[in-house]
Amino acid sequence: MTRKARRCLGHLFLSLGIVYLRIGGFSSVVALGASIICNKIPGLAPRQRAICQSRPDAIIVIGEGSQMGLDECQFQFRNGRWNCSALGERTVFGKELKVGSREAAFTYAIIAAGVAHAITAACTQGNLSDCGCDKEKQGQYHRDEGWKWGGCSADIRYGIGFAKVFVDAREIKQNARTLMNLHNNEAGRKILEENMKLECKCHGVSGSCTTKTCWTTLPQFRELGYVLKDKYNEAVHVEPVRASRNKRPTFLKIKKPLSYRKPMDTDLVYIEKSPNYCEEDPVTGSVGTQGRACNKTAPQASGCDLMCCGRGYNTHQYARVWQCNCKFHWCCYVKCNTCSERTEMYTCK
């Protein structure tokens, strides 16, 4: 582990008041005043604080899963006006967009998937109490397919169930945005479940495959990022439906006249159109594109014309000098030339 990574983990544990101990390949977590510490973590709902106090080891994993989701979000949108950033108060799930847009839909889905992925992985690795390998995928023989369960299958049902209880608990209000958030949370988890992998190993004499054992594994999170980015591009505009006047919304339907069709379980849904993300706006949570690096010649979203929203861009020139064309001379010294290069960088005004 790099020094920077160790420092980041240290800050995380200290901020939560948690001592992380690794004993014999397993991890145990000792909370130092969990009640006090959990009450200081910003943005937690009462149910989430209760889970934090009872399962501080799981809170560390939840934080790692949330960060994994945010990192993937930033990767997928690194070349767009919106780069997975937002204004507002920081929570355990990062800063949140205030409008119910496509971007908010993606954020909720990728974080929900990240938390479920991290919990499931921690169970498989033996780093969490009360969970482990999937007990239902052990020893059963699938005669038609010629293999049986073996190894340690990832218990995705436990991971999704635990993540659902924690992540969904922040949705306290009963309004259209809550319905949207809960739908996108579920979509992220369901897409994770649908992309689980089956790995197998052959057993037999001289490389034959007389018997085969198989187990389920988690997909690479980057794969989920690409799947969810496609879902973002095809996100469905929805609106709330109320059972009667003056009642809270009960479900979401696709926003089309004379239609009550509900979105698919794995659709990302949004209730408001996206802002253009050109300017900083506390109302929407947009941080704007001022100061963002752009590509002068690119025609797509990362190009300066689109990224800078017509405001123009600044040009920064840099000189890089290094030793090059080095040769060894007998005996015994090395002679190098000095090479230099001028580069330009462009940032939005």
From Swiss-Prot:
MF annotations from Gene Ontology: cytokine activity; frizzled binding; signaling receptor binding
Residues listed as glycosylation sites in the UniProt record: N83, N127, N295
Cited SMART domains: WNT1
Compartments (UniProt record): Secreted, Extracellular space, Extracellular matrix; Secreted
UniProt region (Disordered linker), positions on chain: 238-266
Keywords carried by this UniProt record: Developmental protein, Disulfide bond, Extracellular matrix, Glycoprotein, Lipoprotein, Secreted, Signal, Wnt signaling pathway
Disulfide topology: C73-C84, C123-C131, C133-C152, C200-C214, C202-C209, C278-C309, C294-C304, C308-C348, C324-C339, C326-C336, C331-C332
Position of the signal peptide: 1-31
Lipid attachment residues per UniProt (O-palmitoleoyl serine): S206
Cellular component GO terms held in the UniProt record: cell surface; endoplasmic reticulum lumen; extracellular matrix; extracellular region; glutamatergic synapse; presynapse; Schaffer collateral - CA1 synapse
Gene3D superfamilies in the cross-refs: 3.30.2460.20
Free-text description of this protein's post-translational modifications in UniProt: Palmitoleoylation is required for efficient binding to frizzled receptors. Depalmitoleoylation leads to Wnt signaling pathway inhibition.
PROSITE patterns per record: WNT1 (PS00246)
The keyword Lipoprotein belongs to this UniProt entry's keyword annotation: yes
Keyword Signal: yes
One Gene Ontology term from the biological process aspect of the record: uterus morphogenesis
Pfam families: wnt
Annotated CDD domains: Wnt_Wnt7a
Domain comment as written in the entry: The intrinsically disordered linker region is required for recognition by RECK in brain endothelial cells.
Binding partners and assembly: Forms a soluble 1:1 complex with AFM; this prevents oligomerization and is required for prolonged biological activity. The complex with AFM may represent the physiological form in body fluids. Interacts with FZD5. Interacts with PORCN. Interacts (via intrinsically disordered linker region) with RECK; interaction with RECK confers ligand selectivity for Wnt7 in brain endothelial cells and allows these cells to selectively respond to Wnt7.
Its job: Ligand for members of the frizzled family of seven transmembrane receptors that functions in the canonical Wnt/beta-catenin signaling pathway. Plays an important role in embryonic development, including dorsal versus ventral patterning during limb development, skeleton development and urogenital tract development. Required for central nervous system (CNS) angiogenesis and blood-brain barrier regulation. Required for normal, sexually dimorphic development of the Mullerian ducts, and for normal fertility in both sexes.
UniProt record similarity statement: Belongs to the Wnt family.
Note: Male mice lacking Wnt7a fail to undergo regression of the Mullerian duct as a result of the absence of the receptor for Mullerian-inhibiting substance. In males, mature sperm fills the vas deferens, but sperm exit is blocked due to the persistence of the Mullerian duct, causing male sterility. Wnt7a deficient females are infertile because of abnormal development of the oviduct and uterus, both of which are Mullerian duct derivatives.
Disease implicated: Defects in Wnt7a cause the postaxial hemimelia (px) phenotype that is characterized by limb patterning defects accompanied by Mullerian duct-associated sterility in both sexes.
The protein, known as: Protein Wnt-7a
